[in-house]
Every structure is written in C-alpha cells, then in structure tokens.
Amino acid sequence: MFQLRRLQYEDVEWIFDACQDETIQRWTLIPRPYSFEDAAWFIENEPEYVTMVIEDSESSMPLGLVSIHDIDEITREAPMGYWIAPWGRGMKAASAAVKLLIATITPDENIHSVIAYIAEENTASRRTIERAGFVEVEREWGMAREFLNEVMAIKYRKTL
C-alpha cells in the first residue's frame, strides 16, 4: 500500500539520487545534469500547484513524486505528472498515487478534469495512467519530451 505526504527538506537527498536515473531523465523535464542544488531548489520553491511524495505506507520509504502542475482557469483542466524512483518500480505505486492525489484534490470547484500528456513511446507511463482510470482523448505533437526532444504525446483525461 501507498500514501502521499507533502515535500520536506529532508527529501532532497533521495530526490537527487532518483533524478540521476536515465528513465526519469528521459521522460521528464528535470535539468540535465541534475544537481543537489536543483533538488534543493525544487523543494524550497515548490513550483507546482501541489506536489506530493509517494511513500510505501509500511516502511515510509519514498518511492517517487506525483503533482498537479497548475490549473487552466478557462478549461479547468489540471495537468499532472509523476515519476517513480528505480527502487520503487514494478509495485504499481504510480497508479495508486495518481488515484490518491485525485482523491486529495476532490472536490475542487476550480478543477473539472485532470489531464496527463504522455509520450507515445512511454508505454509504462501509459499503462499507469490507464490503470488510474484515465482515457485517451487526443494525440498532439510536441506536448511531451524524450530527452528534451519534442515527441508525439497522448493526452489522457479523467473527468472529476
């Protein structure tokens, strides 16, 4: 089982370690190279609407992050993202965390739906978001990155 909690400064070390992973660097927009200072800045400034640490509920071991990036005031769509550290993969932590995050933000009259743009080639993340109840709504070029290069993205939506 999994739980979510707010970021704490003590998370800086494991976030730094996790973000050295090639898979995280491949599919996210983190700086490259990723420094300890980058991790500290992210925690201190928390640039997202909400960011939560995904933890194993028995051991409290941090496994990854899940976040709502912002809220579009016109469409009331809330783009989200997530990543799982190498030591947390294969446990379905991300799909559980997506469901937990949606339960945490609901009800919020400012959010009509949560969306995720996932690179077409990122099959693991596509399975994750589908397990969390999202449905494919369209495909757009350039809304996702692979090693910072624009690629075809699939837009997924879950209406609240």
What positions do the PLM features span?
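A generic membrane alpha-helix/interface feature
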Residues: 38-41, 47, 128, 151
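An amphipathic alpha-helix signature
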Residues: 9-16, 36, 40, 44
